[in-house]
Amino acid sequence: MNKLDKLYKLCEDENIQIEWVNFNPCILGVYISDKDIPPTIALNKSIFNDRLKTMEILAEEVGHHFTTNGNFANRLLHYSDRVRLIKEEQKAARWACNFLIGDDELFDCVKKCTSEDELIEMLDVSFGILYDKLRFCSVENMELLYNICNYLKSV
């Protein structure tokens, strides 16, 4: 089962509905959770035929299902609201990266690949997801980066 199929299966298991809608082009996905309706992820129809972009956006929106507290659909009138929104977006993005690229998978692929493009292809993710995963690793898991760097030095 590929990563996108795993995301769809997770949505099914969590009773998250997925809707394809015509959004403004700058909005690619939205997670909606309200007591009166089941959790729903609305994805922009413009990414329907782009498997990697769909996987990236869907993973982040599923990340909101597991990490976001509160409703951010309201207008952000105060600076503290914007800061809180940024933190929630970071949590969802971190969840997405960890779901799509496990630490062991990243380390194993780094050992086998000779280029960034090869690494992206082997991990079956977009450059953006790989970049974010490495950025989050640099903050959270220095041991993983240390192991990757040591391996690269020994090659």
Functional labels for PLM-detected ranges:
Residues 1-155:
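Active-site hotspot residues in diverse enzymes, especially metal/ion-binding acidic/histidine motifs
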